[in-house]
């Protein structure tokens, strides 16, 4: 089967934003205007197509990244049919893992901002993630019909707070309840949408006289930005002071793909104004898969030699699995992005991350939660495979003969944990299955068993994250469970260097056990992680036993000496030891290393580390004193305060343990008028009184 849409007419685009910027509503309008839905779904009545999980419709927020494919020919049908694969990403900070996974496989993103709130905490988090993957962006300032809306103020915030380079491609005609339309700065025409047909049609008029001067000024800035794309455009602009419409578009596209600028648009998705222009912008300014660098990877059977795959159907097949989901009707869905080659239903692929062969049975294209069965996928496609057994998020699927491992995704460590207990014996078995499936879907969610109490512990990125997990167990897997109070995931670290030795010897007739190690245990910089160094000389410990030493150390650092929390940022060097020709084996050296580390860490002045959260509170000014006083009581440190259209924004760092129940306290303190967000920032040493209390409680 030949390719239907040429690769240069593909756009893989993410819609990303802060919670409540109107991201899902924007996506809904895109689906309406591209003909994927015939009825508008509204978030506030729980009918949005892209928010397909029950919890999403109940809470009015997006949790999982729903993927959908649509086609667009332009507002004036001026383009060939373009295929746009859209991923709608969650805006809540507890679900940044979903954003991270989406950005990894996208070629471009549309950042949606609220015209009133502007750059909010989560905008900064998502922006950093997009910078990490070098994703080109366009911006859409939504909710221009709301009180306090100001398009150019938000553009300025993107510059000052996010370090972006926004280039307005439009200016708004009116704002708040008087928002009527936009002025297109390329054609210098005013666009007004028809409210009678939900904005499906529009008309252009002359620019209102009072906006002519501002439009000319902003147009000049836009042309300057386009001219910077290359020497030819700059030369023409300097000579003639003008560029043609096509040259402006060429320059803006080039600068956007290089992530030099962010073309900015505005509108009101809810009032059906401005969304079609954003679709046109995706086609004109966002990269196709051909505009993006070849995907890098390693040849796993050639000692990490670097390899790459160019985009194209005639290249060997390579794809990245970026999400696992459980569908109530078909079971496991593995979402993947195809970077090169062609894959047909029934083909075998090699999972190079796991070293396993998989058969691709059925494949589907997703439209939110509706499935359309397809027979093949090609370079540039985003699709889902049904029923793959051993694939996890971040795995590479590739050609059986031409193996490659694409870049791995990095996932954050959980910072909060809860104990969950099934209510009945029947629930016990179901809970195990449910948690296994949920953990497979979400790498930032972990399940473990407390060795002493036997309790099942679930850990995640925040209270809402774990709330939703528990909620899904009840709704999707019919598991009733009791939930314990949230527990903070502390860490342990050493503060001084220690050298220590341990001899493990059991020799009482017959074959015994013998392992003897000398370890140098040193603290590392925060965030450096674990490092193992082998300095054995002269074979005092045979080479084959050194991996067992490393394994013993790694197992021991999972359970620290103060309160059983993982030990972080530690460097361990094995530099001496001894062995016995008959009695030494891997197990003996593993035990010796484990015991040596445990004793050594106790001598290295260990300390407890607690997670610190970056907290941002938006509050009316008259409550500011109360809010700051409360942050101080919670051992928080205020780092900045900024004016906002509705009051003050306070930035602080607060220990996670002090933030439990904060939502209710803030609500009652400000009569429900303040809002906050928080995300994990770093681990720092807990004060002695706090550490003593935690250690005493856990060692009872």
Swiss-Prot record:
Keywords: Cytoplasm, Elongation factor, GTP-binding, Nucleotide-binding, Protein biosynthesis. GO terms for biological process: ribosome disassembly. GO terms for cellular component: cytoplasm. Residues 8-290 form the tr-type G domain. It holds the Pfam family GTP_EFTU_D2. Catalyzes the GTP-dependent ribosomal translocation step during translation elongation. During this step, the ribosome changes from the pre-translocational (PRE) to the post-translocational (POST) state as the newly formed A-site-bound peptidyl-tRNA and P-site-bound deacylated tRNA move to the P and E sites, respectively. Catalyzes the coordinated movement of the two tRNA molecules, the mRNA and conformational changes in the ribosome. This is Elongation factor G.
